[in-house]
Amino acid sequence: MTLALSLFVLFYILMLAVQQYRPWVALGGAGAFLLLGKLGVYDFTLADAARAVDFNVLLMMAGMMGTVFLFIQSKMPARLAEELIAHVPDVRWAVSVLALLAGFISAFVDNVATVLMVAPVGLAIARRLKRSPVPVLIAIAVSSNLQGAATLVGDTTSILLGGFAGMNFFDFFWMEGRPGIFWSVELGALASLGVLFWLFRDQRQPVHVTVETEVEDDVPTALLLLTVGLLIAASFLPEPSGGVLHLLYTLRSGLVCMGLCLFGAARACWRSRSLRPLAETFRALDYDTLLLLFSLFILLEGVSRAGVIDAAAQLFHSAAGDEPLHLYLLLVAASVGLSAFIDNIPYVAAMLPVVQGVAALMNGGAGIEPELFHFGLLTGATLGGNLTPIGASANIAAIGILRKNGETVRTRDFLRIGVPFTLAAVLVGAGSLWLFWGI
């Protein structure tokens, strides 16, 4: 086990150190464990690796990426932003509305894509009013990060949780007779919106915005809504007993997302009488993230086969004792702190089996249901990224946009918004989760 743990720590550090090559580092780690399996050090074969890969998650990710690209190209997000801003009285309300819009979109769309959609509107408003766009774009970024945990398709970490725990789209709203994580995220969002409103309390300059953007195609919006609807419907399908139907059942969410994406791209090709839209849609996919997830599935299965996951679960159980509240607080606090500085995708992927193992050790070894701890892990890992400028990809994207537009973003500018926003969201979100699931 020492060899496996050393290898995992080495490859994890390399993923943090060379961010631009992290998919290849993860793939190298997966290859290393497969080699050890081939040499007989661990019981880990190529067939085991293939079974470890959650192709449903990968298909969901790829399909949503493609549909979101078509949605952005239709200019519907910009139109929505202009329509909303045209009805607000001042800057304070404009920033709050943009943050709300970014959060709403991010519940169904990748966080970085959300920032790319909404940021141009924030920039335009700030320029018209001759104000710094820095706090506006920071507010948009942290709001998009928060809402990513609200639904199954809102963020990569949510999709990872859904795949690992066998959760469907509806489970994020209501699960086992209790409110799902969606409601805790929304309560946290209300608290953090109050923080934003307070931070911008002096920004009372009137806003005058005209609706200028023309939506080029309504179908991508319909496809996005249809994707959500079909994912909900797929949640209620009965599970077949076996064979090809069972295989299709295990891939149902991925097939829905990928099928609608391909339909949208094919329709765009038909409208333009060329294959260019299809090529652009496939170019828009985030292949680095897809390869990273593919590799992590194999790497973490190898780590698990070596006994590292069980040892980590024992360590967490020893630290928290047999008290669920202690474990919950430890998970949330550790996730918030670590995700402020490291990427939450490999962190969540690594911690999900650990959390499952700790839950099995609770209650004197009889085990308890892990849902509370899964939701706590996701909440902490998602919100922790808002503490620092480098804690989440959406933050980095927003800062990149600002720098391209000649703006200087100081760390204290980000912390002034990110820290109180995160504290409010974590306290209310994690607190409500405990009320729903822990008592």
Each language-model region and where it sits:
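Alpha-helical transmembrane segments of multi-pass membrane proteins
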Residues: 91-104, 130-147, 172, 177, ...
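Hydrophobic transmembrane alpha-helices of multi-pass small-molecule transporters
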Residues: 1-72, 79, 175-314, 407-409, ...
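Membrane-embedded alpha-helical segments and adjacent helix-loop junctions characteristic
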Residues: 47-134, 289-364
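Helix-coil boundary and interhelical linker segments in multi-pass alpha-helical membrane proteins
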Residues: 167-171, 357-372, 435-439
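Re-entrant/interfacial helical elements at transmembrane boundaries that shape
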Residues: 80, 113-124, 137-138, 151-167, ...
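Hydrophobic transmembrane alpha-helical segments of multi-pass transport and channel proteins
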Residues: 148-149, 182-190, 337-344, 382-390, ...
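Alpha-helical transmembrane bundle and helix-membrane interface signal
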Residues: 124-134, 166, 170-180, 200-209, ...
